[in-house]
Amino acid sequence: LKDNGVEQLVFNYTSWGKGGTENRLPTSLTAESGLGGSGDFKRMLAALQEQGVPLYLDLNFTDMTKSQWGYSTKRATAHSVLREPAIQYQYKMSTFQIDSTAKYRYLLSPNQTGKAVSQLLGSVKNRAFTGYSANTLGQKLYSDFGENFVGRSDAETIWTQALSDL
């Protein structure tokens, strides 16, 4: 791109982590193997840093498509007013109906956000990139009506702290 006249380039890299679009919680900086794995990821980081290109790794701290170590889709998710796991469905653009073929996403309880951010930051040794972007924390705001109730204003405070920590 630089060879073709693009002078200012900034990368916001999405779906780069282990699980890709499956939305595993980013508790470590493990690259998706389908993108070349850790070796290629480190080489890309070095090349971008050498060329002075800022890179922001996108992190999703609100959505899970399945359980993972330490985060169960039954216990770590937010709960609806009916006390059932809060789920976000995907919709077909053509009909606005729920897409029954697409995986739905469980919404992580705001109470779990700080834990996930701390785990991620604890796993980072050398940060060879510019920073993080946390798109979903800026796009969604929801309550958790589970045992440990979290209202929207409390969720906003928790997410603001998470963004500050990142």
Predicted regions mapped to residue ranges:
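Catalytic cores of secreted/periplasmic lytic hydrolases that degrade extracellular macromolecules
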Residues: G5
